[in-house]
Amino acid sequence: MTFVESVRSAARRSGVDLPEAMIDACARHFALLGTWNRTHNLTRIVEPEEAARAHYLDCLMPLLDWPAPATFVDIGSGAGFPGLLAALAWPQARGTLIEPARKRASFLTLAVHALALDARVRVAGIVEQVELGDRVLSRATFPPGERAKLAGRVADEGEVVVWGHPHDLSTWEAEVATWGFRSLPARHYRVEGLEPRCLLRATRGTAT
């Protein structure tokens, strides 16, 4: 099964209908990722069906029906998950992809151009030099201490969003309380063939 067929099939089985333009953009990114991955080891997930579910739909599903922020920042963007997918799901939002590893940042810069996102998405290497946006996203793994440092720079009405699992909810609530934040209702979803997932959310402001 091709990557495009895999995305369509997994989306349908997961109960979502992806626009053809979004599927095409994902396919262009996957092709570019495959080329770079031969020499730069950007991801271990290279098989089309697995990548469609574990990378692309896992990033897109919880964002598709969520009102877009004006701005977002993806911390530890890696190969573009979830930041590049967030840019596709939120076509009016301006985004910053933060990736300190030079080779990965070079890939992201090329991918942003290949997907014609240059006008509203930029790549940065140092989080301390970036103004954090309305939504701070992270699918990367960070120690709680590192997340606490990042939270200290989030605007009063900003929101921290972390990809996780339902069993993470209780520890998440305890963790964000140490930042002076409060947890927000998680966004639950399930990609066909994967375990239940959710977006863990927190803010220090009045957002709901």
What is the meaning of each model-derived region?
Residues 76-80:
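Class I SAM-dependent methyltransferase "Motif I" SAM/SAH-binding loop
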Residues 81-85, 92-96, 100-208:
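S-adenosylmethionine
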Residues 59, 84-87:
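Hydrophobic alpha-helical segments in the ANL/AMP-binding
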Residues 1-69, 73, 103-117:
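Class I SAM-dependent transferase core
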Residues 72-75, 86:
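Hydrophobic packing within well-folded, soluble alpha/beta domains
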Residues 65-66, 87-89:
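Short, charge-rich binding segments
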